[in-house]
Amino acid sequence: MVVADEQTAGRGRQGKQFYSPRGTGIYMTVVVHHGRRLQDAVSVTTAAGVAVCRAIEELTDKHPQIKWVNDVYIDDKKICGILTEAVVGMESGLAEAMIIGIGANMQTEEFPPEVENAASLDADVSRADMIAAIADHLWEILDDGYESYIDYYRSHSMLLGKAITFIRDGVTTPATAIGIDEIGGLVVRLEDGSVITLRSGEITVRPRCTKKS
């Protein structure tokens, strides 16, 4: 595990910059060696999301929610992002290691204009204590397997039952989020009634705006 006090070139999903000012957030990277399939990356990301939420609930009176697949929100504001990348073996085709990046705003007071809908945890807890709690919960979850946390993940989802849109290969599609499968995939019902499961890390899920009459 590597922890930084600041990131000068923090990176989020799809190459976006991750704002990481000195001394105000948690910037940690965990490397997990396991030899899993690439599609299991989504389950590792969901495990990290649960670890962050459990740590927040353990150390504060906040009530976090998870926006599939990699963001943690409090009061509809993003306070944490998670990025998982794989190191793939050339011969095996397996993910020999998963690199889990966790960035959480602890006491960040100001955000640049391009950082939308962000907020800080703003709780009376040290970064060191929060990092230790996240790491403890993450190792416990990874040791115990999917069954130990998937119900928790579902109960903390901020999307289930809501109308959403997802973007895949540049195409925006309306759907309804109806479930989380056993390894963390988002199950959605399309407008034609068909049901699919989203797994790709390049999918962006946004609550669909509804017009007021």
Task: Write out the residue ranges for each language-model feature.
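General beta-strand structural signal in soluble alpha/beta enzymes
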Residues: 4, 64-68
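N-terminal lobe of the biotin/lipoate ligase/transferase fold
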Residues: 1-58, 78-80, 88, 196, ...
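Long, positively charged amphipathic alpha-helical accessory segments at protein N-termini or as interdomain linkers
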Residues: 46-64, 74-213
